[in-house]
Amino acid sequence: MITIDKILEILKNDHNFREILFHEHYYYNWTQNVTFNALSYDSRQISSDTLFFAKGATFKKEYLDSAITAGLSFYVSETDYGADIPVILVNDIKKAMSLISMSFYNNPQNKLKLLAFTGTKGKTTAAYFAYHMLKVNHRPAMLSTMNTTLDGKSFFKSHLTTPESLDLFRMMATAVENQMTHLIMEVSSQAYLTKRVYGLTFDVGVFLNISPDHIGPIEHPTFEDYFFHKRLLMENSNAVVVNSQMDHFNIVKEQVEYIPHDFYGDYSENVITESKAFSFHVKGKLENTYDIKLIGKFNQENAIAAGLACLRLGVSIEDIKNGIAQTTVPGRMEVLTQTNGAKIFVDYAHNGDSLKKLLAVVEEHQKGDIILVLGAPGNKGQSRRKDFGDVINQHPNLQVILTADDPNFEDPLVISQEIASHINRPVTIIIDREEAIANASTLTNCKLDAIIIAGKGADAYQIIKGNRDNYSGDLEVAKKYLKR
């Protein structure tokens, strides 16, 4: 619960309070005792003791009217909608949501050790490594793109990489109730752009890498804006871990100079000196030989990043070693074998850079024909389409089948044609994703061949016109076509 007095105190201290407006009268304080027992930004989830946040560019007064009909008595907004209830007017509703929900849930962030990962790719894999390292001797909760757990037993799919602040602090409070000791999070650039983690300080923040992504009309207008919002995690962490091989490393290095930090990768103290398919050796703070189930040097680097972060949280080298050896990630480099010996790789690679690294790993182990099944999502990350084409052009022997991948409100054929326009040779377009996978499965001949199904990973749905339509998932579909 939270009182109106506490809300006004929070907003005034953050210089985010304008006034309370009710029936054209302006108030700096509110003399009546009002207590709220629920917070909501969904007008369909309202009771008489709910504080409602009228947020978003698409918010309509009809939503507020519906909430008032359901018993709403107070709301927070950047705009006065002229309703017959008081409005707390603020300059920035997203900041208000974060700080008010933090207090409403009794500051759960102070009762957990917080570990956050950011980067264009690898966040989920690194989070899973950290989860397995910590769970050897601790009770970690995890908020991940792939799966979320607040008790270490039950897992559910997240809708956003980083939840809205009201949901985030509610989930943190649930983790505290479940006696969890740590919280591992993926923090997206959008989370900082939309202030979902405003006011939150992490015990350790990890910056894995950066490459152009999430640039478009409803995301970041430029790469500079994307990169800037990624770097905000560094400013809001008590200690940081940074990949020394990442693009634009020098500015990040300067930014973290006075923050406790570890660098990993080439030209740093913590570097891989030997890399094999299922083991690697590290020198530096983590010096040891590690067994690993996820192939690819980039996965080994993600393991190092997670290990250095966990080391700062007091985890032993032995627990880090055990955690790395136990880690698997749904939809990340999952491998099937056809009856003819050919391999099928199912992976979440969903931008140009992650596709480039995936192809490099597969080509290292499979020397025959390689077939790529790929699509791009609609209404987001539009720069990926050209990036995919550029990567494919660097692999002239790659056979390509373009297909649907969460087209949302766009036409999947148009998306596929746009990707194809950036490819310098003919490709096949099969919009039905299962049909595309079935077709690819007929093109292999021997154990040297491989099929790569990229983009969706373990997602068992297709986003079409704003809805999550049923889809078996790439791995389950691929299993149907193993006989070849």
UniProtKB/Swiss-Prot annotation:
Residues involved in UDP-N-acetyl-alpha-D-muramoyl-L-alanyl-D-glutamate binding: S43, T161, T162, S188, R196
Record-listed ATP binding positions: G119, T120, K121, G122, K123, T124, T125
GO molecular function: ATP binding; magnesium ion binding; UDP-N-acetylmuramoyl-L-alanyl-D-glutamate-L-lysine ligase activity
Positions of short motif L-lysine recognition motif: 405-408
Modified residues (N6-carboxylysine): K230
Keyword entries, A-Z: ATP-binding, Cell cycle, Cell division, Cell shape, Cell wall biogenesis/degradation, Cytoplasm, Ligase, Nucleotide-binding, Peptidoglycan synthesis
The enzyme's E.C. designation: 6.3.2.7
InterPro entries cross-referenced by the UniProt entry: Mur-like_cat_sf, Mur_ligase_C, Mur_ligase_C_dom_sf, Mur_ligase_cen, MurE/MurF_N, UDP-N-AcMur-Glu-dNH2Pim_ligase
This protein's record includes keyword Protein biosynthesis: no
Reaction catalyzed: UDP-N-acetyl-alpha-D-muramoyl-L-alanyl-D-glutamate + L-lysine + ATP = UDP-N-acetyl-alpha-D-muramoyl-L-alanyl-gamma-D-glutamyl-L-lysine + ADP + phosphate + H(+)
Biological process according to GO: cell division; cell wall organization; peptidoglycan biosynthetic process; regulation of cell shape
Post-translational modification: Carboxylation is probably crucial for Mg(2+) binding and, consequently, for the gamma-phosphate positioning of ATP.
Main location: cytoplasm
Annotated compartments: Cytoplasm
GO CC annotation, single: cytoplasm
Coiled-coil zones: none
Associated pathway: Cell wall biogenesis; peptidoglycan biosynthesis
Family stated for the protein in its record: Belongs to the MurCDEF family. MurE subfamily.
Known role: Catalyzes the addition of L-lysine to the nucleotide precursor UDP-N-acetylmuramoyl-L-alanyl-D-glutamate (UMAG) in the biosynthesis of bacterial cell-wall peptidoglycan.
Protein name, per record: UDP-N-acetylmuramoyl-L-alanyl-D-glutamate--L-lysine ligase
Organism listed in the record: Streptococcus agalactiae serotype V (strain ATCC BAA-611 / 2603 V/R)
